[in-house]
Amino acid sequence: MKNLLETNVYDVGETMIIAGTCLKYMQPKAYEELEKMPGEIYEVCLEAIHVNMVITKLIGMLSRVNIKKVIFASVDKSPHCIQLHYIESEITKAMPHLKTEFVHYVALDKALKEIDEKTIKMSKNLGGLQVLLKE
């Protein structure tokens, strides 16, 4: 596993796996699933650094290298790690013509569970969630 922010913007392949630093030791079985996926794993801890630093770094990488797929993976229920899943939205706003595929996973019950874009967007919309829960 490489540190994302310490990686040169040109030193990336076609698939990047970006995982919360704690995933490896908090959910080792789920992390093993990540290790079986094609691509290099990059770690980032959003308790230690601001999400905007990660967004800027990834935009730099995506604008220089033909990255076909970015996978985000985190532990579930972390107020910090959830920000990993918001990065796609910020990147696509800055780079609307980007053709990179984004996939999101959370580690749940010792396994990775894919999370869809609608769920991620709704997690940022507390008012909308409140309405849904009241129905």
How should these model regions be labeled?
Residues 1-135:
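Iron-sulfur-associated redox domains of electron-transfer enzymes in respiratory
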